């Protein structure tokens, strides 16, 4: 599945144009509980939605590390209102939740089984990251917790249709979160580059990510400028593109034990 991506400070201008490509009367918005407003997304998204003749149902009542119960609750809401397009605005967990909702709305199967059956067409999914780190906007994986154990759900249909990487959403990110998210992106780029399944294309994406992240990440943590934020956002996207091809290796395998609770 091919994904469309818009990068940079003018990328947000494409959101309304993309939404107008689809025929729908009810939009499902998956968003962060607090970040949606603090990053400046709320005013922008409200203005865009006002240009559309549609209702909007919001879903934000879920854990930072989404649980299977959060997924089930979101699916009930999505089905109740018969929404026909999904937009996600938030960090990695928000984007993962939207990806899982879109996937399991159309596919049956126990989320941690790895065995899924398509039952109906996928809903369009547009994602807008508000952090520069996970690369979730560019991958066909999503993380889910079941009984306090971390699982990765993988399927080509999990990849969002459209990613809009609008760096200004990251301009107010706190220092600690900037560092954690940025190091996540750098680690994924390196992990993809040394991967046994690396390809010419994944190497190109990984190198592009490293070239953007390596010099700018320390600066964006200690004395950020908008230009640096732009480069780190772009680097995180390319890191996601790289690891989407190679998949993960030992660092991610170790992380599952560290992040299970």
Segments and roles (model prediction):
Residues 6-8, 58-60, 87, 127-128, ...:
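General beta-strand structural signal in soluble alpha/beta enzymes
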Residues 256-261:
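Catalytic phosphate/nucleotide-handling subdomain of diverse soluble enzymes
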Residues 1-85:
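ATP/NTP phosphate-donor binding region
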Residues 141-246:
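Carboxylate- and glycine-rich phosphate/diphosphate-binding segment that chelates Mg2+/Mn2+
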Residues 63, 89-91, 247-251:
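Active-site nucleophile and cofactor-binding loops and adjacent substrate-binding regions
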Residues 69-167:
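Glycine/threonine-rich beta-strand-loop-alpha-helix active-site module
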């Amino acid at each position: 599945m091919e994904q469309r991506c818009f990068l940079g400070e003018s990328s947000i201008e494409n959101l309304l144009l993309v939404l107008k490509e689809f025929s729908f009367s009810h939009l499902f918005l998956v968003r962060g509980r607090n970040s949606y407003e603090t990053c400046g997304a709320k005013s922008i998204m409200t203005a865009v939605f006002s240009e559309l003749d549609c209702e909007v149902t919001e879903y934000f009542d879920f854990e930072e590390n989404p649980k299977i119960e959060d997924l089930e609750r979101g699916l009930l809401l999505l089905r109740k209102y018969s929404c026909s397009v999904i937009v996600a605005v938030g960090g990695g967990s928000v984007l993962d939740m939207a990806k899982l909702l879109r996937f399991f709305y159309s596919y049956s199967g126990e989320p941690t089984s790895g065995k899924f059956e398509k039952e109906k067409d996928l809903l369009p999914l547009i994602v807008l990251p508000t952090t520069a780190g996970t690369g979730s906007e560019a991958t066909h994986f999503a993380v889910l917790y079941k009984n306090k154990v971390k699982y990765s759900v993988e399927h080509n249909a999990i990849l969002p249709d459209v990613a809009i990487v609008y760096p200004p959403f990251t301009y107010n990110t706190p220092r600690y979160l900037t560092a954690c998210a940025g190091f996540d992106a750098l680690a994924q780029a390196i992990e993809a580059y040394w991967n046994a399944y690396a390809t010419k294309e994944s190497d190109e994406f990984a190198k592009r990510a490293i070239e953007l992240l390596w010099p700018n990440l320390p600066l964006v943590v200690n004395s950020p400028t908008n230009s640096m934020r732009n480069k780190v956002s772009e680097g995180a996207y390319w890191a996601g593109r790289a690891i989407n091809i190679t998949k993960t290796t030992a660092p991610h395998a170790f992380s599952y034990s560290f992040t299970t609770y």
